[in-house]
Amino acid sequence: MDGQMRITVLGSSGQIGAYLSEYLSRKGHIVREFDIVNGIHQDMTHIPNTYLRNAIMESDFVFFLAFDVGGSRYLKKYQHTFDFVNNNTRLMANAFGLLEQYDKPFIFASSQMSNMSYSPYGTLKRLGELYTESLGGLVVKFWNVYG
């Protein structure tokens, strides 16, 4: 990423996204932070989402870190619910559809759990990897972001 770029960070308020956004800003990039904590207009499960469309369309690069997740206790309690699966499926369909439409380079944040087919979270992350590969994006897999 040489020179100043317009970068969108999907999931910019999360454990990784907050630090990544800060780092990219310090490096002189124009960072558009996109996260549901910024308001309902940044809820990526809403289709269509004009704010998300504009964020992706106006970017040179996108970091796709957003996911409906919240640590091991959250996963244990919610990953087998309709809402969890529905939210993440919609979120991915929305973002990947726009990344394809505007042909934007991107990185998708996956997980070491993506090979765990018994876990809805793992299965959804694997689906994200397949979307990413089909669109020519890059996949990064995190093991444990909490230390």
Give the ranges of each region predicted by the language model.
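Structural motif
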Residues: 6, 60-61, 105
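N-terminal Rossmann NAD(P)H-binding glycine-rich loop of SDR-like oxidoreductase domains
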Residues: 5-27
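Conserved beta-loop-beta element that borders a ligand/cofactor-binding pocket
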Residues: 106, 110-111, 130-147
